[in-house]
Amino acid sequence: ACGLDRLIGDPRWCLHPVQVMGAVITQLRLWAEAIGGDRPWALRLGGGLITAVLVGGSAAAGWALEQLSLHSPWAVPLLVIALASALAGRSLRLAVEDVLTPLSSAPPDLEQARRKLGWIVGRDVEGLAAPELLRALAETASENAVDGLFAPLFWMLIGAGLWSLNPALPGPLALAWAFKASSTLDSMLGYRRGRLQWLGTAG
């Protein structure tokens, strides 16, 4: 899975599991806000249900594919592809290189570097000088390396350990997708503003 991620990364033409998770979160959020209104307790309950549905559903989908791969050899390549989809090492490396390339040109193309950096950070990058751009790039690269590479690998290892004890237990894909679901929830709902301060509590 790591080799596949390094080789092809996340092709833009291919539907990514995180895109599906994001679409589900968006729809469930609309329903939760329509039903809960501005009542904190109702929004917290709705957020808890969103978290349970998304994390539980992602883990269940991963577990189902794992079980299928145990009994159907043709499903093994699908399992490997699914595991690779939980990793973002190549995508992160390319995103970092997209910022470093204009910075290393002579003279540095700061405007291009700011534009590329703006795609991967959640802060205002206008007016940043080269040292500040590099600092912001280093910060976001380290954060995304945890969320996109090291944490999924950690949960894959835990899942592999569980699988070795009993193949019926959740394995590497189930735990990796559950983590990606919780990470996506945090990035979309984990804000202390408006209704999200209650809706995003569980996520």
What do these predicted ranges mean?
Residues 1-203:
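Hydrophobic alpha-helical transmembrane segments
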